[in-house]
Design a protein with these regions (language model features):
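Conserved beta-ketoacyl condensing-enzyme motif
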Residues: 1-11, 173-193
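Flexible glycine-/small-residue-enriched beta->alpha junction loops
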Residues: 1-49
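Condensing-enzyme catalytic core mediating Claisen C-C bond formation in acyl metabolism
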Residues: 13-20, 24, 44, 54-58, ...
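Phosphate/pyrophosphate-binding loops at sites that engage ATP/ADP/AMP, CoA/4′-phosphopantetheine
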Residues: 44-50, 157-173
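Stable alpha-helical structural segments in soluble proteins, enriched in small hydrophobic residues
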Residues: 108, 153, 157-166, 186-194
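Short glycine/threonine-rich loop-to-helix capping motif typified by GTGT followed
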Residues: 140-145, 180-203
Length: 209
């Protein structure tokens, strides 16, 4: 391992072409996999299908509204909630606007010491108070200890990060969270995994605004 005073981590997803069988689980699609997440969540918490669908639609509308404000966003079109609710079904219960677009892009962040950061003369710097990572090879899907209704790695990483940062009540102490939003149900479930919503209450929190 090497240490550096200044580093620039960069992320650049690129979606290439490939066959359906070129996968860990052949013929499994991303919409299908996350539709299973939605079904598992709905079954575990006894959620009404229409309530789940409307909560996901609210998330999609919000995300499109945010994209419309970003000049660098791939998709910058606002979508009415009725359009989301009535969009073509991709993988039940996920409709067209519950699924992300396919984009090539990149992002980077410059990470350095507080001393060097101050010398840059910038006024929009942030301090990293905690940094945690949890990864999985997906084998939990083969065990009955995981019911498929949540992201185990998100729960592990967030618990460690909150402990490192000294956060006891994330719902009250955290004012901004940027989450992976590949599908609308992803954000819904992540709200609970990050303890912003109580388990089984994310739908109600979204619909309540």
């Amino acid at each position: 391992y090497r240490a550096a005073h200044c580093a620039r981590p960069k992320l650049g997803p690129q979606r290439g072409r490939g066959t359906l069988n070129n996968m860990t689980w052949p013929n499994a699609s991303a919409p299908g996999s996350f539709a299973q997440l939605a079904a598992a969540y709905r079954a575990k918490h006894g959620s009404a299908p229409q309530d789940l669908k409307r909560a996901m639609a609210h998330i999609s509308v919000k995300s499109h509204d945010n994209g419309a404000k970003n000049p660098k966003a791939h998709l910058r079109n606002k979508i009415p909630i009725d359009t989301v609710m009535n969009s073509p079904m991709i993988a039940e219960p996920l409709g067209l606007y519950d699924c992300c677009g396919v984009s090539d892009g990149s992002a980077c962040a410059i990470v350095t010491t507080p001393e060097i950061a101050k010398s840059l003369g910038k006024n929009d710097l942030i301090t990293v108070k905690a940094l945690q990572l949890a990864v999985s090879n997906g084998l939990e899907a083969q065990h009955n200890s995981w019911d498929g209704s949540y992201f185990a790695t998100t729960r592990i990483a967030s618990k460690r990060a909150y402990e490192e940062a000294g956060i006891r009540n994330p719902r009250e102490e955290v004012n901004l969270i940027e989450v992976h939003d590949c599908f609308s149900v992803t954000e819904l479930v992540t709200m609970e995994d990050l303890h912003i919503s109580a388990e089984g209450r994310a739908i109600h929190d979204v619909l309540d605004g």
